[in-house]
Amino acid sequence: MKRTLGHALIIIGAALIVIAVLLPTFLVPRLRVIPLDTVSDTITEVRDGTLLDSSQLGKNEPTPNRKNDPRCKAETDEEKRDLPVHCFINDKTPMQSKRHVEIEEPADEKIATLQVGTTLLRDDRKEPKNLINAILDRITVDRSTAYPVDDPISSVAINAPQGGSDTKPPTFTRPGIQYQFPFGAQKKSYPYYDVQAMRNFEIDFVGEETQDGVKVYKYSMTIPPQNLYESLTEHFTRDGRKLTEADKSSLASMRLSFPAHKWGLEGDDDVELDRYYTNVRTVRVEPTSGVIVNGTEEMFMFYAKDDKEAEEIASKAGREKEAKEQNRTAMKYTAQWDEGSKGRQMDRAKEARKSLTIGGTVAPWILGILGLVPIVIGFRIRSKSA
C-alpha cells in the first residue's frame, strides 16, 4: 500500500513539474495579446500654440492679438479683404489634444480593431466652436504582434464626417505600428504610420529612461515636410475612388490661393500655396507590454509653394524667420501628455507586465516546487517500504 502511494506521489510530482516547464509555452502567448476590453484615454496639457484662425479669416477680421498690429488696420471692406494672412494667425491660442481608443468589431482571439478618435481643441472657446481638427481612425491589428493585418480594411476619416455613403472614407492596407508597440519591444527602429501624412516612417530607439520607477524605452522620429494636399488627395483617390464632397471639404484648407501681398509677398497676382506638415514625435514605451506610456509631438503646419520652399521654411533659420513674420503658419503646437494620461497608461503597462510575470515565471516556479514535494515524499515512502 505504501509503495503504491509512493508511486502515485512521484507521478503527481512529475506531472506538476512537466506542467511547470510547459506552462510558459502555452500560457504566455495567450497573455501576450492586446486585450479585447482595451479602452484608453490620453489627453495633452493645455499649451499655447500658433493657429491660423479660419473663422476670422473668413470674416476678414483680425484675431484679438493682431488688433493693434499696424499691418492689420482696416476700415473699409476692400481694406479688410486685402489684410495679410498674418492678421489671422493667433500665436497665443490655448490648445489641447484628446484621444480615445476602444476595441470594435471585427475582433476575436487573433485580431482586434482599434477605433481611435483624436480631436484637437482650442481651450478658449466653447463647443462646437472649439474644434480645430478631428480624426476617426480604424485599424485592425494582429493581437500578438500589434502590426496591422495584411488586408485593406483600415480607414481614416478626416474631421470625422457623419452621414451616408458619400462620407465613408476609403479603406486600405495599413503599414506600420501606431498605438501599441509589440510585446517585448526591442532597442531598434520600427515602422510607424503617421496618420496626418498618411505615410510610414521609421521611429528610432534613442535610449532608456525611468518613469514612475519603471524602465522605459525612448523612441523618436522626425517627419520631413509633407505636402498634405497631395498626400490626402492620393489617399482619397486610391484604387480609382472618386473625390466626394466630404473629401473636397477636407481638402479645402490644404490648398489656398490669395493675392501675393496677402502671403507677405510682393505683387497682386494670385499665389496658390499648399499646406505642409512636419513633426518631431517622441514616445516612451514599457518594453515588456509594448504599452506607450508617454508621448510628445512638435507639430508644425505651414503653407509653401513647393517642396523646396517647404524645406527652407522647416529649417532652423526658416522657423525663426516665420516665428517673427508669421505669414505662412497654419498651426504650430507642442503636444505633451498630461500626468493623468501617463499614469493611466503606466497602470495598464504594469498590469500587463504583472500578468506576464505570473504566467511566465511565478506560476511555473510554484508548480515546480509543488511538484518536487510529492516526489521527495514519494521516494521516502518507497525507500521505507522496500
Curated annotation (Swiss-Prot):
Start and end residues of each stretch annotated as Disordered: 53-78
Family named by the database record: Belongs to the PorA family.
Chief place where the protein resides: secreted
Superkingdom to which the source organism belongs: Bacteria
GO cellular component annotations of the record: extracellular region
Species whose genome carries this gene: Corynebacterium amycolatum
TM spans (from-to): none
Compositional bias of kind Basic and acidic residues: 64-78
InterPro entries: PorA
One example of a Gene Ontology biological process annotation: monoatomic ion transport
Keywords: Cell wall, Ion transport, Secreted, Signal, Transport
Signal peptide residues on this chain, from the entry's feature table: 1-35
Pfam families: PorA
Name by which UniProt lists this protein: Porin PorA
Location of the protein in the cell: Secreted, Cell wall
Residue ranges with Polar residues bias: 53-63
Described purpose of this protein according to its UniProt entry: Forms water-filled channels that favor the permeation of cations.
